């Protein structure tokens, strides 16, 4: 790690003395590793959100060899000889081509909002990028350095794998893309036919499936495994025992039939395995990281498959907390928040997002070697708050963290939940935490006077844990630090012409009487629409980043913003043309 200090010192030579003092007193910022791979030399490449760098370490993680800065947050990487393809995103999603020889970015290819998960196609002639917020996957020609084909999926693609014959790509949709006031709400895996680069199918997973994160394909190409959360939204949030609210699972997809087969729970009857993240497999093992309980599961693959295939009623499998009994070892890791990992030979290389501790696990002995990659690492209150928000150790039996219902940087899971704070049998749609501290009251029914109160009540009544006040204040600080992602509906950061017309419709319909001010809310209760449960009505939510928080209305009955206006006539008491509805939708989705 002396290399890092050496690089930092040399980079500061031209800085002002005051700048040097400021950095020295601040200590080393967290890495917040977004991706990690080994290159052909066996070196460890890591993209870091916290520093906006691509770092190259020795294989053991003890020596920093090179560090390359980027202008936006690096989200994923793909090494190829003397080049590294790096996806970046803050305002503009791009695939950046870094020359390791010169240390310069040779090209920055626009791909789409939320660029992540770069990967080569089976023939290595093209690179494929998931655009999380553009809801698309693009094909990039690395020679011409431009996007040559694009296909839309459902909602927030974040990972993908190819079938062994290369004919199909299977893509995760992070969240459900549907209305929430129905019996079955679940995210899907989209299937892309590669010849025509078209979506041919959406495979819906088990009821409650959300936060789809990792994917892998079995060596024989028969099955694809998808790691995800499994929300039990059909029951009140009255307890946690035996996964009453949230469980963690991996779904099994039959590749040839392109069908969901069943979901395997990775929790135990009296011990949750929250924060399920990445998944990998070979003939002998399945490996899964649990970012909330800070461990890795090592599953006997042949024994699991034999038991799975002989399981008579697979529709009941996603409630079987004993399924993996005797088939899995839970290996505790050092640090906090294992997410992405590398499976190489006989070892797993696992960074920890909230600690910068590198764990190396021998898959034969399950012995763990830990390396501190960032000595002198310091955390701000906001950093600590994000860590607590994602840590299932602050929950009874480790079943969930705040991330369980608010995945994707404290946003929404797209489902309805029957919280106990306003009665029973009246489910409400999950809200994003963005700007919650500056737009009181909290909850759509306004039952919490402030987000500060809601944070403490959430730990107590949802995670059945009593937080210390210092911890709660850090979570407040984290939530206050959240900032909106620029809307993918914007054009070069500005309203499109259609959205400008929609702004006029917004003003004509007097939407601003309730959705006013910098956050587009008057922070008051209004009786509007049908099925008004409470005398005072509903709290007025912010419209900032509303493009990201579907479904809409208090119970998620509107799958899209267009349905809010066209079907449910929200706030509309006069005839409005189809053209005006489309323009209004464009404007609101641009906020």
Predicted features along the sequence, with ranges:
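Secretory pathway export signals and precursors
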Residues: 11, 15-16, 107, 126, ...
């Amino acid at each position: 790690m002396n290399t890092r200090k050496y690089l930092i010192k040399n980079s500061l030579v031209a800085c002002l003395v005051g700048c040097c003092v400021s950095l020295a007193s601040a200590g080393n910022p967290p890495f917040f590793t977004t991706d990690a791979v080994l290159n052909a030399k066996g070196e460890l490449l890591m993209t870091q959100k916290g520093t906006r760098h691509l770092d190259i370490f020795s294989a053991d993680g003890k020596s920093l060899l090179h560090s390359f800065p980027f202008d936006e947050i690096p989200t994923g990487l793909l090494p190829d000889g003397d080049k590294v393809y790096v996806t970046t995103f803050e305002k503009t999603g791009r695939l950046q081509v870094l020359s390791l020889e010169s240390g310069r970015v040779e090209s920055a290819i626009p791909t789409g909002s939320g660029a992540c998960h770069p990967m080569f196609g089976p023939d290595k002639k093209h690179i494929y990028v998931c655009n999380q917020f553009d809801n698309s996957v693009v094909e990039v020609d690395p020679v011409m350095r431009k996007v040559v084909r694009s296909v839309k999926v459902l909602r927030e693609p974040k990972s993908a794998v190819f079938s062994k014959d290369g004919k199909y790509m299977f893509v995760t949709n992070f969240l459900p893309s549907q209305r929430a006031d129905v019996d079955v709400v679940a995210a899907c895996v989209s299937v892309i036919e590669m010849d025509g680069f078209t979506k041919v199918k959406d495979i819906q997973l088990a009821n409650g499936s959300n936060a789809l994160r990792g994917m892998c394909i079995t060596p024989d190409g028969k099955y694809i495994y998808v790691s995800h959360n499994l929300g039990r939204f059909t029951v009140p949030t009255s307890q946690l025992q035996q996964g009453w609210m949230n469980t963690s699972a991996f779904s099994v997809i039959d590749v040839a039939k392109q069908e969901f087969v069943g979901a395997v729970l990775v929790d135990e009857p009296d011990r949750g395995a929250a924060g399920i993240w990445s998944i990998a497999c070979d003939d002998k093992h399945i490996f899964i990281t649990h970012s909330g309980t800070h461990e890795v599961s090592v599953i006997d693959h042949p024994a699991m498959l034999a038991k799975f295939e002989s399981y008579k009623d697979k529709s009941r499998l996603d409630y079987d907390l004993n399924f993996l009994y005797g088939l899995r070892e839970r290996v505790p890791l050092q640090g906090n928040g294992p997410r992405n990992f590398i499976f190489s030979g006989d070892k797993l290389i696992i960074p920890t997002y909230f600690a910068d501790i590198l764990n190396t696990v021998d898959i034969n002995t399950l012995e763990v070697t830990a390396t501190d990659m960032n000595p002198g690492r310091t955390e701000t209150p906001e950093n600590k708050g994000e860590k607590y928000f994602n840590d299932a150790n602050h929950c009874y039996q480790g079943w969930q963290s705040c991330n369980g219902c608010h995945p994707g940087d404290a946003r929404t899971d797209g489902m309805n939940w029957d919280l106990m704070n306003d009665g029973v049998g009246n489910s409400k749609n999950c809200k994003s935490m963005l700007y919650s501290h500056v737009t009181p009251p909290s909850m759509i029914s306004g039952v919490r006077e402030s987000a500060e109160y809601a944070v403490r009540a959430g730990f107590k009544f949802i995670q059945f844990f009593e937080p210390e006040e210092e911890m709660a204040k850090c979570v407040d600080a984290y939530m206050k630090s959240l900032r909106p992602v620029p809307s993918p509906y914007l054009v070069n950061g500005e309203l499109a012409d259609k959205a400008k017309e929609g702004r006029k419709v917004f003003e004509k319909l007097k939407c601003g009487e309730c959705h006013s001010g910098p956050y587009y809310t008057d922070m008051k209760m209004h009786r509007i629409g049908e099925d008004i449960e409470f005398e005072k009505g509903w709290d007025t939510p912010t419209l900032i980043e509303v493009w990201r928080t579907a479904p809409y209305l208090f119970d998620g009955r509107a799958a899209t913003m267009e349905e809010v206006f066209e079907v449910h006539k929200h706030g509309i008491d006069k005839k409005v043309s189809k053209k005006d509805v489309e323009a209004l939708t464009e404007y609101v989705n641009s906020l």
